[in-house]
């Protein structure tokens, strides 16, 4: 199946640190605009639990703590996008690209992004939100030390990506310090113009 038809879709990369609220904003965008939300993490987990050949290979890679090859991630994104191409009004690609090369490969194999939404919350805010989430989520990676490490990794990886797309003029930065609705108002002001 050709990726040709994906070129006419709106494709939005959503980038934001852990605790920035990007998951919540993605849900609201899906609800209001009829976009399809694709998270690379969810796709990988679904593939593993499907028990497919690809899933078994992925499980072995992830159990070793290694990074899943870029080609595999792109194939999964492309398959998921093509499966929804006829019914979706657009795509939110969540947690991708994590580096400039991933963005370039995405364009080569799939299509160029329409926008990059940068859900930007300050470090303090993200730490606070994650600690609060940790009280109820039971997620082992929601303790302060791990959180600070995750944020460091996130900033290191994301800054060049943001700079790359700023150079193209497609970054829309959201001040994610406000309430969910305040942040969503900013989102709408950008998406309504597309």
UniProtKB/Swiss-Prot annotation:
It catalyses: a ribonucleoside 5'-phosphate + ATP = a ribonucleoside 5'-diphosphate + ADP; AMP + ATP = 2 ADP; dAMP + ATP = dADP + ADP; dATP + AMP = dADP + ADP. CDD domains: ADK (cd01428). One of its GO terms (molecular function) is nucleoside diphosphate kinase activity. Belongs to the adenylate kinase family. AK1 subfamily. Its EC number is 2.7.4.3, 2.7.4.4, 2.7.4.6. Consists of three domains, a large central CORE domain and two small peripheral domains, NMPbind and LID, which undergo movements during catalysis. The LID domain closes over the site of phosphoryl transfer upon ATP binding. Assembling and dissambling the active center during each catalytic cycle provides an effective means to prevent ATP hydrolysis. ATP binds at residues 19-24, 133, 178. One of its GO terms (biological process) is nucleoside triphosphate biosynthetic process. It holds the Pfam family ADK. Disulfide bonds: none annotated. Thermostable. Changing residue 28 to M: No loss in activity. This is Adenylate kinase isoenzyme 1. Skeletal muscle. Monomer. It comes from the Eukaryota. Residues 132-142 are annotated as: LID. Optimum pH is 9.0 for ThTP synthesis.
């Amino acid at each position: 199946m050709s990726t040709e038809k994906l070129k006419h879709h709106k494709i939005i990369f959503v980038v934001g640190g852990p605790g920035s609220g990007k998951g919540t904003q993605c849900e609201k965008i899906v609800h209001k605009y009829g976009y399809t939300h694709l998270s690379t993490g969810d796709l990988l987990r679904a593939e593993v639990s499907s028990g497919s050949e690809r899933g078994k290979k992925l499980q072995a890679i992830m159990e070793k703590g290694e990074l899943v090859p870029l080609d595999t991630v792109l194939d999964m994104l492309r398959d998921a996008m093509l499966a929804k191409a006829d019914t979706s009004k657009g795509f939110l690609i969540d947690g991708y690209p994590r580096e400039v090369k991933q963005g370039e490969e995405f364009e080569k194999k799939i299509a160029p992004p329409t926008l990059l939404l940068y859900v930007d919350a300050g470090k303090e805010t993200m730490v606070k939100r994650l600690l609060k989430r940790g009280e109820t989520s039971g997620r082992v990676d929601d303790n302060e030390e791990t959180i600070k490490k995750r944020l460091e990794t996130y900033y290191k990886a994301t800054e060049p990506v943001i700079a790359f797309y700023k150079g193209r003029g497609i970054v829309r930065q959201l001040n994610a310090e406000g309430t969910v609705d305040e942040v969503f108002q900013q989102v709408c002001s950008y998406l309504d113009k597309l």
